[in-house]
Amino acid sequence: MYRQIDEDIILKNLDRLEEEAQMNYMSKYEPTLEEINSVYNHIKNFIRERKRIVYGGYAQNALICKQDKGKGFYKPSDLADIEFYTPDPIGDTVDLCDMLEKKGYKHIEGKEGVHNETYKIFVNFHNYCDISYMPENIFNNCPTMEAEDLKMTHPHFMLIDAYRVYNDPMTSYFRLKKTFGRFNTLMKCYPFNDNMIYNKFSYDRFKDDNKINRYIRKHIIHNSKLVVVGHYAFNQLAKMAKAPPTYMIECPFIQVISDNFEEDLKTISNKLKGNFKNIYYKRYSPFFQFLGKSVEFYHNNNLIFRMYDNNHRCTVYRYSEKKKTYFGTYMLQFMYNLIQYNMAIVRKNNFNIMVYGSMLTRMMKMRDKYLETYNMTVMDKGIFQEFTFDCIGKPVDILRESFLDTIKRREQGKHKFIYKPKGQPGKKPVFKFDNTSGEVLS
């Protein structure tokens, strides 16, 4: 249909043509670029005044541009929605809609989004922002940075979301290209502090060869479907990578992920209580969107074992035939250590900040050294292979679950939350959000 020279020139100009067409349309038709920018400015002022925390693409782009404007990934025509965290999403949705109506805008609507506990704002049929619930204990201590005079979620906290994509091949890889490109640029601007690798830490009560630690490995983990992360997995990876002896860490407790949480909890509790005295456990609520429910086992008041549920993910693993054990892949281990690192920041636990910060930097260093030594890449089969598909468990497709939930509500005569301002301050419905504080359950 086209000469090769014409095909090449068209392909070269497609991005420019799309951009010019979009800008041309918005200069003439509703909602105009002038209106859109005006609404965005009002929303940003609302976020500033209430000291809310911006996350997602808008925050990533703003933080990148703060370091180097030329590296930003949004074009003027992209009109990215602004996502922000709040401990009061319904209140903020109602108040923001009321404020925009008072400013004279039309067709204003706030309503539940696809993702649980997230609400969207539409003005003149354009989607402007996502308002997401964050438990107050996390919101008040969430690490942030400033850009555009707004509180932006810290890059290392947002990085957890990237690793949630990387470790979820079944339901999240449709986001992989966009996520990897953006976060690779973001982390070049805000890398981890390499000096954390030198952190020295010791657990006062640690005994490397203690009886209960060996029992857990041999009688609970070996030949099970539990996937090991944390200290034990870190040391196993370091040994296989032939990392320096100084990289090895004390392992006072073992961490695993379960695909059958309640049944595994019963089995493990019976085994530990049947073989050791003074055993008890504590249950914890999920930690935000990042961790599912968890349980910690204690012996003589010392933490010995922590188990997470799989948080509706198919858990990626690397199997050790020698140890008959499923270990988390490098990327899965990195994500769980990253979550614990940020949880320590939220809880102001300086010891765990030091521990997990050091584990993260050591993991990156040992990986890079190993790959250079053996002339490999992260895509090659081996202990540091990334983006793998072998996993344990049944994943949950959030979009599908949202559609099914909508159907179920409709059948029960229930409806999703929708708010349209009517000239008077709106009534804010009382809604109890799930407990995702990450704190111990009474």
Listing of model-derived features with the role each one plays in the protein:
Residues 1-38, 146-211, 398, 419-428, ...:
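N-terminal regions immediately upstream of nucleotidyltransferase
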Residues 37-42, 106, 116-117, 210-215, ...:
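Short alpha-helical segments and helix-capping/turn motifs at coil-helix boundaries
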Residues 90-97, 262-269:
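Short, conserved charged micro-motifs
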Residues 36-90, 212-262:
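Active-site nucleotide-donor binding segment shared across nucleotidyl transfer reactions
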Residues 246, 301, 322-324, 424-425, ...:
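Intrinsic-disorder/low-complexity loop/linker signature
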Residues 106-109, 115-118, 124, 139-192, ...:
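Non-catalytic nucleic-acid-binding/docking modules located in mid-to-C-terminal regions
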Residues 97-140, 270-315:
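Conserved catalytic core of two-metal-ion nucleotidyltransferases
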Residues 350-358, 363-439:
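Eukaryotic intrinsically disordered, low-complexity regulatory regions enriched in Ser/Thr/Pro
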